[in-house]
Amino acid sequence: DVIDLKDKPFIAGTMEGYFAMRMHVLVRFGKWQEIIDSPMPERPDLYCLTTSMHHYAKTIAFAALKQFDKADQEKEAFYASLKCISPNRKLFNNPALQILGVGEKMLLGELEYHKGNYDIAFAHLRESVRRCDDLHYSEPWPWMHPPRHALGALLLEQGHYEEAEEVYRADLGLNDTVPRCGQHKNNVWALHGIVECLKERNGEMEFNKLQGLLAEALSKTDLTITSSCCCRKTVSQSST
């Protein structure tokens, strides 16, 4: 009812944006079948951001399962859904289309990665990181799944340890490349990634420190984390 308030479009748009964030959670935890089984909104005109987020998530889910025909169909549906979103539509202080631009590059990156087109995939994911960094700060975050977590995980899987380490350092705020508001200090996903990198290059002193932070973070989780992103297929037990 709140979303359908004709006389309060700002409230309607904000609440609809919150509703759309459920897809971020399912992608974050790799709930591919649950994403695929999620029904599309019955009123895409009203739930326009949610509709786009469903297509984004379904593209990533089908790509992870290597069902590429369906992933490509969802990708095209994602682009079609963007046409239903007004350029003036905002989620707090960011245009909705700018926020979804982050997702566009994430879905393209993960789709191309699972197809085996790694260079193209990494180019898309790096652009997703750049676009995410360009978003205005707000709480909650305008884009909930940090693109660096996907980029780092997939770089690691292909043996690009040096770049992956820099990606995680930026995300964790261990260097000065990202403003504080864009950092995710002591984030369990990013800690898992950088510990993997340090293990590969035998950075013993820093490895021991960050592995301790990772162990502490993992003690507070209720699931097993084996990568900074569920989009990666190979797993690592970096806490051991």
Question: Residue spans of the language-model regions?
Answer:
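Structural signature of alpha-solenoid helical repeat junctions
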Residues: 14, 21, 50, 93-100, ...
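Solenoid-like repeat scaffolds
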Residues: 2-12, 38-49, 79-87, 91-97, ...
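"A position-specific structural signal for the A-helix of alpha-solenoid helical repeats
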Residues: 21, 53, 57, 100-103, ...
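C-terminal non-catalytic interaction modules
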Residues: 166, 170-240
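Residue at a conserved register position within TPR or TPR-like alpha-solenoid repeats
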Residues: 26, 62, 112, 155, ...
